[in-house]
Amino acid sequence: MKVYEILYKVYLLEDISLKEVQREIFRIIDITLGKSEDTLRLHNKNDFKNYCFNSFYPIEKDGVYKEGNIYTITILTIYKSLMTYFNKNLPFAYTTRIRGLKTQLKVLPKKKIRKIYSITPVIIKNDQGYWRGIMEKEEYMKRIKENLIKKYNGFFKTEINEEFEIFKSFEFKNNKPISNNYKGKSLLGDKISIEIEDNVQAQDIIYMSLGTGVGEMNARGLGFMGYRWE
């Protein structure tokens, strides 16, 4: 398994506010996926999409991304075929607000990872709403681990022994829930920082997580993680 990085340069056709950014990015990605039967099936299937993306870079301090400026979006995936498809098609994609320009590819080297941390908020869904007040931190951590193992098992079509540790330490970086707009609703998430155990299984799964995202709704720009090597 490899994690593929696509640096996607785009040109803004009009101003986009911070709260609109993720929606506008996944819109241009969705349009691109819809142009092929194979990638449309990936988009529509009720399963892990195994790609994730961050926000526009450079960051605008006033929270407004400007018409006429060029920004970079980082997209990560563990699917080589999807990387190839994005590289071929994203430069020609456009919406009423964003026009694609070019892509640049690389493979993230597989080195020992010391920690990962949220660039975009992590979402864990449950029927009662936001998790705080409903579950303890240990249950939240368990849900994160289970989600990662499901992604790993799904990609490799296996069932690994789950009796191993992934998290050496687990810290929340936000004091209150972070609101994320999706289809007119507010989804509450968290910024987390995790130190990673040294064992091979933990390192393999966390390397994978850079390409899949952590938690849920990764194809909507959530759970995108930064990392620090040893």
Sequence positions of predicted segments:
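RNA-interacting cores
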Residues: 1-230
